[in-house]
């Protein structure tokens, strides 16, 4: 019997200004869905896998075809409903309603486990959407580069007087998310040693210039790091190996990185983490024949790696969990002090979230890189005093290879996002850009996620697990007129550990779009300021007052 999730076809998004659908509001999700499966973008496009273990864009290839066909015929007053990658209904709504509403991987809490999800997945009843895979706004590794860069820069400020020259970062994983780490480290001025078990992933990062060199030898990797740090160079190297074996070996040798983290796909014990002593081929085969055995071996290996990370932490080396839930896995394996070292959000990112600052991203539906160059210039024009952001845009232009449709990410917050969106829409209207722009974000944002082991770890008021906030965010984005809105479960940290929402809005140059953009790109980050103000963060309370937010039970207005 053929596998409904495997097809050798090659999918690429259309380019240019010719419509395949009835309007740009349906053309936009069509192109971004297809862009998610572009072989230059997705990790395993023939299996519909975009990134993050088994994060898919559609449940089956038949579902993909039906989504495409439906988007091509969808009217301006209709909304498509997508349930875990399957197009289940089209309903009449109105012109300002979202054209697509997506719910992926959501399970009733008591049943929200990998075992139960995998049973449903095997029966074809569910799909893991990760964050931006099933919500059709993944832009390749660039999507996480700036967030990782901001994290490393802040770590440098806190631990090394703001200077990472001559320092090096140890990490693991070069997949769709982890692949950003070597480039982000270099941009921040540091060297990076990234351990990756799957050589094809390392080769992909080499081709796209996200990593500088590759080796199979730990000794060679360490020699290179020593050479570069002594010379004050910022370069990166991928070491083909297993992080669960390499990290303890480094501890044993007394090697001292300057920062330690990890971004393997530990959130998914079956599909995301290679057990100690296994080959990649053996691992792939047993994912199908013995998934529970794989998970058991992977969890035991994660415990070994986390113990090594604790050893680094106890030796005084800054060590953080980069949001893959590896500490939780180790804790469940009996490592009682697994959470002694912090997650990256409470350690470095939360002050940004308090101002609604997060991963604002956009893609040029024209396919023309010049459209991104023009929008980069517009960002600089509208935010003239944000020199840190200007520096990021300059580095991104020089170092980041576009994957699929040209795109850009830059971290901006409440008060700036709507200004940029309206400016982009005006550029489409007056012909400066060759086709419309879509604006979206990662689900990792200030008001759109509840994830007690990542984005909402160690909240000031103890509200880490309260998931009303992403639900309210999705509802408000729907009411505000986003072009498509998504509500997912389990992204980043795995089943049972997160709920999160996403939105995308199309700048098609119309005056109607001005109204939608103004609402969505104000309200979306405002929910993040609201959420953090409610938790008692002074930065968020001050920013809410400064921006004139009406928060009755929080500000008394």
Swiss-Prot record:
InterPro entries: Urocanase, Urocanase-like, Urocanase_C, Urocanase_central_sf, Urocanase_CS, Urocanase_N, Urocanase_Rossmann-like, Urocanase_sf. The keyword Transmembrane does not apply. Keywords: Cytoplasm, Histidine metabolism, Lyase, NAD. Pathway: Amino-acid degradation; L-histidine degradation into L-glutamate; N-formimidoyl-L-glutamate from L-histidine: step 2/3. It is an enzyme of class 4 (lyase). Gene3D superfamilies: Urocanase like domains, Urocanase superfamily. Its EC number is 4.2.1.49. It is found in: Cytoplasm. One of its GO terms (cellular component) is cytoplasm. Binds 1 NAD(+) per subunit. It catalyses: 4-imidazolone-5-propanoate = trans-urocanate + H2O. Its cofactor is NAD(+). The keyword Lyase applies. Residues 1-20 are annotated as: Disordered. The active site is at 410. HAMAP family: HutU (MF_00577). Catalyzes the conversion of urocanate to 4-imidazolone-5-propionate. Belongs to the urocanase family. NCBIfam families: hutU, PRK05414.1. This is Urocanate hydratase. The lineage of its organism: Bacteria, Pseudomonadati, Pseudomonadota, Alphaproteobacteria, Hyphomicrobiales.
